[in-house]
Amino acid sequence: MKDTVMAYLLENSIKFKGKPNPKAAMGKILGENPDLRSKVKEVNQVISEVVKEIETMSLEEQQAKLDELAPEGLGQKTERKRKEIELKNVKGNVVMRFAPNPSGPLHIGHARASVLNDFFTKKYNGKLVLRLEDTDAKRVLPEAYEMIQEDLKWLGVKVDEVIVQSERLETYYEYGRKLIEMGQAYVCDCDADEFRTLREQGTLCKCRDTIPEENLKLWEKMLAGELDNVAVRLKTDIAHKNPSIRDFPIFRIERTPHPKNGIKYHVYPLMNLSVTVDDHLLGMTHVLRGKDHIVNTEKQEYIYNYFGWEIPEYVHYGILKIEGPVLSTSKMHAGILSGEYSGWDDARLGTLRALRKRGIRPEALYKLMVEIGIKQADVRFAWENLYAANKDIIDKDARRFFFVESPKKLVISGADSRKIDLRMHPDRSELGNRELLFDGEIYVSDDLEAGKMYRLMELFNIVVEKVENDILYAKYDSDDFAIAKSNKASIIHWIPVKDSVPVTVIDENAEKIEGFAEKDFAVVKEDDFVQFERFGFVRIDEKVDNGYTCYLTHK
């Protein structure tokens, strides 16, 4: 591992005139070496050690070492081919579904299920159904019906058919009635706490032995809105080792007006009934779900068996552990209503809209979710892997600029005015050049100390003389980089005061970072990606007044 890390850091250091940038190197290391993505802590430790070694080398020594470690250049080695994930028992046409609740737009957790279903239906030339599970009126956000479809389109998920459960209530009633007629379901008016106690004891409730004819009468009264505080329960094994499976409910009374149905209906199916009926009628061949649904799978198999239906192939994958942004839809919605969050695309949220706003490309997220796959072990969502994949996509088109955050004015004496031409991109001359004009007054972001030497990137060496009224004063010292190196001078980037462009960068915590970019930054357009050198990649959000608002994508 050390030689690999050393090679990438040497390449990075040479690019930056002898000073390695660990964060930038980390992204490339992980992006081009997938086998190291699970060893981020170890890689970080090795980077720290290697940086110390590199800082003792001259540029010539760095180049010689890089030639020794990677004579054919980095990224030339053949990457080990990853085995493509597959479904079991594929026979004929594959039909799958992605079934979110329309309580808000999609977030990162939804991305896994939607991407994997899309991946498999494309792989096997199958059909993907988007099923909006909106039978709980209290959890429905009306605008989410459209937002979810917009999010899937952005992510590259191809939906072949859209099903809305609240539009299928009569179908669920039909199968609920059949279960009652078969004597496999009954209307229960037991108090919830009373039933819970009986269930824990494995004792039958008084309603269980009601004959089907009487249950059908009660069922009709439920549909007519004449009953409250009743439920329809499915007969299972009252002695089942898992109490939650014992006679679980499949219909309930719900008086909350529904965004689509208003108060037309009072009886709504619970998930295990509606999901089973839909999966059968829509011809699902394979169902992907988290392993937290294993109990639901067992519950649904009772219904399959009562009707004699073929059970689809279930795939239960591990939990995706996501740290960082807010994922709870209810918390996000409450925060938006209170003004805590600016909207569903607030940078602090884990929605796909927030990732899009920050500049995450859908191809990067899609690729990562396929790599995570359907393994049963729980998985930690590695942000660094997403960022590495995203960098692979945007780096080739991202023009480079200097950006000075929290700017401080620096006046330099003893130096002639000069013009510097730099490439917009180190590897793509066709993207053109940018021009910096030094005329004695610049902005810097670093806190400079009086008496110390500093190297202005791509310019010359200075020595700071004093700080007065928040303005820094320095004198020109020399052009020679070797002098800066021998004095261990820090290299700092800078912006000419004249023609500087005001920029606000919003980071992942929704904090605003104010600063200036160089004058040629004004060529950018909305949705462009650029790299602010030694700061990070940003997405251009909008032009405001005489400046720009950008979102920090990642380092």
Curated annotation (Swiss-Prot):
PROSITE patterns: AA_TRNA_LIGASE_I (PS00178). One of its GO terms (cellular component) is cytosol. Its EC number is 6.1.1.17. Keywords: Aminoacyl-tRNA synthetase, ATP-binding, Cytoplasm, Ligase, Nucleotide-binding, Protein biosynthesis. It is an enzyme of class 6 (ligase). Its main location: cytoplasm. The keyword Protein biosynthesis applies. Transmembrane segments: none annotated. It is found in: Cytoplasm. Pfam families: tRNA-synt_1c (PF00749), tRNA-synt_1c_C (PF03950), tRNA-synt_1c_C2 (PF20974). The keyword ATP-binding applies. GO terms for biological process: amide biosynthetic process; glutamyl-tRNA aminoacylation. Belongs to the class-I aminoacyl-tRNA synthetase family. Glutamate--tRNA ligase type 2 subfamily. HAMAP family: Glu_tRNA_synth_type2. Catalyzes the attachment of glutamate to tRNA(Glu) in a two-step reaction: glutamate is first activated by ATP to form Glu-AMP and then transferred to the acceptor end of tRNA(Glu). This is Glutamate--tRNA ligase. It comes from Methanococcus maripaludis (strain C5 / ATCC BAA-1333). The gene is gltX.
